[in-house]
Amino acid sequence: MPPKSPNRSGKSTPTRGRPGEKKDEEKLLQDEEEERLRLEQEEKARQEKEAREKLEQERRAELDTKKDKQVFETNIELGAVKLEVEQVKNDKLAHAEWNRYMKCDGKPDPTSVKEINTFISLSHEKGSPDVNIVLEDAKLILSLISDLNELLEDFTPEEFEQKVDSYRQTILSLQDLLLNRYNEATLKMLKEASYEADSESGNLQKVVDGENETIMLWANLNKNPRFKLFEFENEKISFELPKVLAMADIAVRILRTKFDHYSHQCTTFLPKKKKVKDEEPIPEEPPKPEDAEEVEVKGDEENGEDAKSVVEEGRQSKQSNEPGLVNEGEKEEETKKDENEGEKEDAVKTPDVQIEIEDDEEEILDPDVVDLRQFSPLGGVYHVDLLKTPPQPNIVRGWTLTQIIDKPLSTVKYPSDNPNTGRSSSRVASANPEGRDEGSPSKTPLEQQQPPIGLTFALPSNVMFFEEPQVASWDSSDKHWKTSGITDTNFDEENRKLLFKTQEFGTFCLMQDSHLNMPFQSWELKPKGTNSTVLTITAAIAEVEIEVKDSKCRLNAPAEDPPKELSGLYGKWMAVPKLIAAMRDAGVNVFPAEDSHKFVSIQSKEVDLERVYEQMAILSSTFAFSWSKWNNDAGSKQVIIQIAPCLIKENVPRDAVSDDDWSIFSVSDDMSYKLALSEYDEEFADVVAKGATYHCDLLHAQYERQPLKTATKNCWNNSPKNHKTRTSFSFTRLPHY
């Protein structure tokens, strides 16, 4: 029989596990172990994250508390400075008023409309035309104008809004009075021209020098047909007259003034005020279309009246010799105030967007109009006038016969359709009926008969011109400096002379780009002791060094080849506004205006720089500051500067700060910290330096530096015991100017 099968009985017998099943079990166990480890790691990571978040929250809370404390301390210090500035302003005004009262010299109070009107009236009625007396009166008038300008500069319009228009109108009235006094002196000299005629030429050639002006007068008494050109030798100013004027009863007056009474009348003299858009939603019930049109038209009419009144005030002041212009201006101002108060609600409802659009349209100037935000008039103003010579005294049989003419100084219009040239223009035209010159077919008959006038101005010896100056003439109707009508300009750089031709007589000035020395190449601010520091600026062309001590400052001369044009400024201590004005008048403008970024290519920074400057001023007695090349690589919300400690005493050498002392700091509106960066690195890295911490401002970032805590704290601590070492208010208030 065959053998039985093992499973034939039907009972199951144990079998060995398959290899695949064993692997599955091992994998399952491994997955379970990995899952357990993963959960443990996640739990550990969660706990660590919670711990970090808790620490971060605690750190942030600590930083917030620290920041609040630091901001509070800084605000106290800066607030004290601002209060001191306001007190200084008030004391200055009271001191000036008291000095005027104590002098008792008969000088009128420029802030009193009544006294100014009385002064103007008496000047018209009793003022002597003698040139020496006129020059003395000019000093008084200019001092009154200067006092009013200082008031307008020291105080913002918001501080005495009701007086601004009155002060400006007073300035215009005084300027018109001054020009009228010059005309009276000129007329008197012309009436006596034959007594002072030159023995060789037979013409009047007279120059009168004043403290602020020079009157150059030439009268055509001889009427030499060969006359062509005359030069005032000492002043190096000459004019070339066309032949059509050689036989005329005319005189030429060139009045050169060191002051400029025209530019402030331009619409581009001051920067445009930024209009703040009203974020309030439009009312639910907007005005009807008819009402909206009425409001818009009404606003336009008011704006038109305001603009027209400024021009008309200047015209009326020149046409009338009677006082009272200031009162009329005040009446107009009161009338406008009443109208504005009555329409206040309508004005609020008028959209601000429309006003901004109107401002943008005003900024679009004609090509020949000089933008005073971009260019600056330098060297004063040249008034070149063609005058009519009054009848001269005649001597008959020992008697001197003088024709009495009670008329003001009269000007001769040139070019004119019918010029008074000794022969009628019709005769000249009849010689060439077609009005055509074969040699110059492009010229008109008027240009052939009355060619342009040639003028040569010597550049002022106290003004630096870094490029060829631009000539501009004053347009009295538009109240702008313009370049139209100026031709054939030729600049003699070696002899510092500018030659040009003009079709009309008038008022001229020399212009230069205000931003020639911008942007700066570098700058440094180094202390020389308590309340004393030196600012060195390497500009695009010039290099200047300004020393500041207490509330005064001065321009230091360079060691080698100091410019002769600035010799009158070197070493003279002045108040900050006066030094800024003096340097600008001398052609060295290193003081950016609030809108200079429109004309200079720079990286704009969205940082409150004024607040940074204030803190730098507080620290400037013990810290040196400098520019950093990384400032351009940083973002718009960061300012990168170099700072070095200077625990020095008085009169320390300039090179007391070594390269190793400088550290680089990042400053923003809400944070300041030291960077792990040097000026010699190849790439910019915004990384906090080892051991440094974040601070709310520059002031506290310097306070943490060892071993300077005590010295830095004394720079700005208000404690009386630190009075000798802290920076004074008179020094820290300088940035406010």
Curated annotation (Swiss-Prot):
One of its GO terms (molecular function) is microtubule binding. Residues 1-61, 274-362, 410-452 are annotated as: Disordered. Residues 1-15, 417-429, 441-451 have a biased composition (Polar residues). GO terms for cellular component: axoneme. Residues 18-61, 276-316, 333-349 have a biased composition (Basic and acidic residues). Belongs to the DNAI7 family. This is Dynein axonemal intermediate chain 7 homolog. It comes from Ciona intestinalis (Transparent sea squirt). The lineage of its organism: Eukaryota, Metazoa, Chordata, Tunicata, Ascidiacea. The gene is AXP83.9.
